[in-house]
């Protein structure tokens, strides 16, 4: 089964979930050849007893349009995360979570999925585009910020801090990087294809399933 790359962007009011809330999220699902096969986005109600981190809220004041966009048509997190997991499961391939950097976005998404649905359709794993950029570019890891990457890696898409815009822009970037990686494989005489997933992932901790009770 071919992999489907689920480019995901999260907007939040702090650095970690629980004390702070995920305000908005969006995913754009791409095939390896950059066909967009679907999107999912939602603006979420705040978590009970959570509050914005002062530094994050200071930053949000510099992005009033993006703030307004993520605070309209608010949805219940439990309902939306259940719908999101259903959407991921219906994708026509093995879903791979993709983000730049994955450490931030996957932390929020994994926490919300586990809390409100008890499972993650991505298992425990996320593909970090920053690490991928390091491997492709030869730049040191901390230098792998978007302004330092080759301009021809990017499509002419906006980065607005509106989750869906950013998920689409990031997904196109990933597919361009994936194409470059495939070219490198071809130059080495290796098959010019994305290797298919073979078996479902085992839990990261022996004896622990990635599914837990949502009660």
Residue positions per predicted region:
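Conserved non-catalytic scaffold segment of RNase H-like nuclease domains
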Residues: 2-6, 11-100
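Short His-centered aromatic/hydrophobic patch
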Residues: 9, 120-121, 133
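Acidic active-site catalytic centers that drive phospho-/nucleotidyl reactions
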Residues: 9-11, 31, 105, 128, ...
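Active-site-proximal helix-loop-helix substrate-binding element of RNase H-like nuclease domains
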Residues: 46, 57-61, 127-168
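Acidic, Mg2+-coordinating catalytic module of metal-dependent nucleases/exonucleases
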Residues: 96-102, 107-108, 145-206
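Substrate-binding/catalytic groove segments of enzymes
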Residues: 116-121, 139-147, 181
């Amino acid at each position: 089964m071919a992999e489907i790359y689920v480019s995901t962007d999260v907007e939040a009011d702090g650095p970690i979930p629980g004390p702070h809330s995920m305000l908005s999220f969006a995913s754009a699902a791409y095939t390896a050849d950059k066909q967009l096969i679907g999107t999912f986005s939602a603006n979420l109600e705040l978590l009970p007893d959570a509050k914005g981190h002062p530094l994050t809220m200071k930053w949000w004041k510099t992005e009033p349009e993006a703030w307004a966009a993520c605070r309209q048509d608010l949805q219940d997190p439990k309902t939306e995360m259940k719908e999101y997991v259903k959407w991921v499961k219906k994708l026509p391939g093995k879903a791979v979570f993709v983000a730049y950097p994955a450490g931030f976005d996957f932390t929020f998404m994994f926490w919300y999925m586990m809390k409100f649905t008890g499972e993650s359709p991505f298992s425990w794993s996320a593909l970090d585009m920053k690490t991928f950029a390091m491997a492709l570019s030869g730049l040191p890891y901390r230098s792998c910020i978007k302004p330092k990457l080759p301009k021809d890696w990017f499509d002419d898409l906006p980065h607005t801090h509106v989750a869906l815009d950013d998920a689409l822009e990031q997904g196109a970037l990933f597919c361009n990087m994936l194409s470059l990686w495939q070219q490198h494989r071809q130059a080495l005489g290796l098959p010019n294809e994305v290797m298919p997933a073979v078996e479902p992932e085992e839990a990261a901790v022996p004896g622990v399933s990635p599914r837990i009770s949502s009660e």
